[in-house]
Amino acid sequence: MSIFPTKILLATDGSREAELAGQTAADIAQKTDSELHVVHVLASPLATHDPSSFEPEVWARLEQRERTTLEDVVGKIEASGGAVEGSHHTAGRPDAEIVVLAEEIGAGLIVMGARGMGRIRRALTGSVSDSVVRHAHCPVLVVRE
């Protein structure tokens, strides 16, 4: 039995920190022969609104922009020689959606970036990475710049 995960979930928002996490996840997946899955979540509060409350063109542009972010991340990983087994786009609270998807696909590791929020802001609002670390069923690797 290997101590390495068979499935890795990379959570991305397209940020610089997430790009570094993507490079890390791709390296780990390649070196451990693990499947790599990538998720991008259309974050609240937009995701909690009924899409019909937006002009159809506005909602379509939002969704397309978010899908493009996911496609760009997958493209960069594949261009650097990595392989992506699955790409997932969803909407909702990013922390909750990441944890749920990790469980659904049986991920053995979640990899994500962390933004450098100050202590006061983090105390007031929390962070996606903090919440995922607390609630995930598997180890979480938080990559910092």
Outline where the language-model segments fall.
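Glycine-rich, Arg-bearing micro-motifs that act as flexible, cationic patches
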Residues: 109-131
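A short acidic, glycine-rich active-site loop
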Residues: 55-68
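Structural beta-alpha unit
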Residues: 1-4, 75-110
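Small/aliphatic-rich secondary-structure junction motif
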Residues: 2-53, 86
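Solvent-exposed polar/charged
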Residues: 30, 103-104, 134
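Short secondary-structure boundary segments
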Residues: 40, 113-115, 144-145
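Short, hinge-like loop/turn segments at secondary-structure boundaries
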Residues: 53-57, 103-105, 128-129
